């Protein structure tokens, strides 16, 4: 049953990551690409020409205390044990692109895999110091949760980071309603 949901996504990922010669040729044009073509180009460039391999270590989960009852918070796991792996690169503007796969213990202490693409516009807030950077962007991918029978669920979330040399503290916020969603999730990313 899950294959019915995954097959279209798997075919699309295959097409992006393993383009035919004719598809690869269409990626090289005069820079007048639309959003979809730029996204495919960035995914393909990151996959084929990643500058670093990355280790992901989930660091914390925080359920927003203004949107959750104390009973719910007391039942939830906020220590997301797990790990992940990815490839990443910096583009000509110094912006970060990454493709990742991570698995961690979710709020119910069940395994949750997530995989996708991340983009961050990078800034160097301290003049003359290229080692320290801040990032702001998004991540788009697919996750699967135990409480949803591990059906693939697409995600599009904000992404922010604090970076120093090869270490990044990345974070996102999952929006939601009362007692649902509204979760801050953070992880460490180490460039190997």
Swiss-Prot record:
SUPFAM superfamilies: OMPA-like. It is found in: Cell outer membrane. Gene3D superfamilies: 2.40.160.20. Disulfide bonds: none annotated. Residues 1-24 form the signal peptide. GO terms for molecular function: acyltransferase activity. GO terms for cellular component: cell outer membrane. Keywords: Acyltransferase, Cell outer membrane, Membrane, Signal, Transferase. Transfers a fatty acid residue from the sn-1 position of a phospholipid to the N-linked hydroxyfatty acid chain on the proximal unit of lipid A or its precursors. This is Lipid A acyltransferase PagP.
């Amino acid at each position: 049953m899950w294959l019915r949901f995954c097959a279209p996504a798997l075919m699309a990922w295959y097409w992006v990551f393993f383009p035919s010669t004719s598809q690869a040729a269409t990626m090289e044009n005069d820079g007048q690409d639309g959003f979809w073509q730029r996204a495919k180009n960035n995914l393909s460039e990151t996959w084929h020409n990643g500058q670093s391999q990355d280790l992901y270590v989930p660091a914390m989960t925080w359920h927003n205390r203004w949107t959750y009852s104390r009973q719910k918070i007391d039942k939830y796991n906020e220590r997301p044990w797990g790990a992940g792996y990815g490839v990443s690169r910096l583009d000509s503007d110094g912006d970060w692109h990454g493709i990742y796969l991570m698995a961690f213990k979710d709020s119910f202490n069940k395994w949750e895999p997530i995989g996708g693409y991340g983009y961050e516009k990078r800034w160097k807030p301290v003049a003359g110091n290229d080692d320290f950077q801040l990032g702001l962007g998004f991540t788009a991918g697919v996750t699967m949760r135990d409480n949803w029978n591990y059906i693939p669920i697409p995600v599009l979330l904000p992404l922010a980071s604090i970076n120093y040399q090869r270490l990044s503290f990345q974070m996102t916020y999952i929006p939601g309603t009362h007692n649902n969603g509204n979760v801050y999730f953070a992880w460490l990313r180490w460039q190997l």
